[in-house]
C-alpha cells in the first residue's frame, strides 16, 4: 500500500464535467483537501459488522455506525487517511457517502416517488465526494505505472535466464539456511508452480500495458466520464422497483453532469442504497470486492478472505500462538492469518490431497508475489500445509493455542448424515490438541442442529462463549466461539476400556 500512500501527495488532474464545467484538483488545493472530512461506507460480511467496526476503530481511530441494513458500516475520516481505508481486511466494498437520509418520506404513488428521485440529483452536495473519487482514481493510475516498472524489471530477469536461476538458488539457500518447512520448498521447485508464476507475471504485464495505454490516452485526450447508477433496495413498502429507481435517478444524474451512461465500461459508479425509509447516495471507491485477495487456486467451497479475517479476529490471536485449521480446503483462513498475524505460526491441514495441493499452491503463489514486489528473496511465511486425518491429528496433546476452521456444511461438501459422526469426533480431537484453559476454537457451520447436539456432549471440555450468525453464499450459518475448559483430556479408552471406538470418522 506504499503506492497509495505516496499518491496522496500528488494528484492527477481529472476532468469532471459538472454543469458543463471542468472541476480540477491542483497542488494549491492539496492542503485543504487533506483536511477534508468525509463519510465512508463499507459493505462487510453479514454478521461481522461489529468485527469490522472494531478493526476501523483500531486501525483508523474512527468510531463506526452500523447501518440498520445488515452488512454495512459507516465512519468519518480525513481524506489523508483514504490509503489506510483500502488496507482494511474486513470490508468487501467501499464508497464515499454523498448524502444520507435517515427518514426519507416516500410519496404515495410510483410517479411521484420517481419524480422526487429525478429532482434529488440536482440538490445533492456532489463536490467533496467527487474530490475523494478523483483522489481514489489517482491511486489506481499511479499504482499501475509503478506496477509496470516493477514487472518490466521482472520480465528482463526472466528473459535473461541466468539471473532467474541465480535468484532461485539464492531463495532456496535462504530457505534452507533458515530451516523453513520442506513443503513450501518442494512446491517452489515444482514445475507446475514455476509455470503458474510465469503465467502470473505475463498476465500482470499485459494488464499493466492496457491500463497505462488507457491512462496515456486520457491524459492527451480528456473525455467525458462514463457512469452508471446501481440501486440496492430492501423493504416491502416500496411502490417502485430497483431498476425503476436507478433508471430515473440515473437519467437525472446524466442531465446534471452531462456524463455518458455505460453499464459495463464505466468510470464512476453512483450508488443508491434504499433500506425501508433510509436512503443513502454514494460513489463507489472499489471496482471489485476487496475479498478477492491471496487465493489463486480455488476449490468448490473457498471461503471469502473477509470472512476468514472476521473469524480470526474473534479468537483474538496473541504473539507466538500456534493457529491450526484442520480442514483448510484452499487455505483461505491460514493464509489470511499469516499475512495479518505474522508473529503467529499457522498450520493448514486437510484429509483431501487435492485440497492440500491447492493450499500449498496458494501459499507458494503468495510468497512469489511478495518476492516480485520486493525484488529480492523473501524469508518466507509463518505457515505450512500438511495432509492429515481430522480425527487423528499428528499433534501433541495441548500443543495448539487456537483452532479456526470451516466445518463441512453437508451441502456442496460431505453430507448431513456424515456430520452426525464427524462433528463429535472433530470436537473430541480438537479438545485433545488444544491447550486447556487458554485454548480457543472458532468454528463455522451451517449444520447448526448437528453441531449443537455434538457440543452438548462436550461441555466438560468446551464452553461456548458466543455465536455470530453470518451469511455464507446465501446460507444462514453460525460461527461458534468456544473456550477450552481446564478439564484435562482423557482418552476414551481410559474411560470405556475400548480403544478408538468413538474416534473413528465414519464415511
Curated annotation (Swiss-Prot):
Any one Gene Ontology molecular-function term assigned to this protein's record: tRNA (guanine) methyltransferase activity
Pfam family, one: THUMP
Record-listed E.C. numbers: 2.1.1.256, 2.1.1.-
Domain of life from the UniProt record: Eukaryota
UniProt entry keywords in alphabetical sequence: Cytoplasm, Methyltransferase, RNA-binding, S-adenosyl-L-methionine, Transferase, tRNA processing, tRNA-binding
Localization: Cytoplasm
Coiled-coil stretches: none
Residues covered by the THUMP domain: 165-285
Catalytic activity: guanosine(6) in tRNA + S-adenosyl-L-methionine = N(2)-methylguanosine(6) in tRNA + S-adenosyl-L-homocysteine + H(+); guanosine(7) in tRNA + S-adenosyl-L-methionine = N(2)-methylguanosine(7) in tRNA + S-adenosyl-L-homocysteine + H(+)
Cellular compartments per GO CC: cytoplasm; cytosol; nucleolus; tRNA methyltransferase complex
GO biological process, one term: tRNA methylation
Oligomeric and partner information: Part of the heterodimeric THUMPD3-TRM112 methyltransferase complex; this complex forms an active tRNA methyltransferase, where TRMT112 acts as an activator of the catalytic subunit THUMPD3.
Family (UniProt): Belongs to the methyltransferase superfamily.
The protein's role, per its UniProt record: Catalytic subunit of the THUMPD3-TRM112 methyltransferase complex, that specifically mediates the S-adenosyl-L-methionine-dependent N(2)-methylation of guanosine nucleotide at position 6 (m2G6) in tRNAs. This is one of the major tRNA (guanine-N(2))-methyltransferases. Also catalyzes the S-adenosyl-L-methionine-dependent N(2)-methylation of guanosine nucleotide at position 7 of tRNA(Trp).
Name of the protein in question: tRNA (guanine(6)-N(2))-methyltransferase THUMP3
Organism: Homo sapiens (Human)
Gene this chain is encoded by: THUMPD3
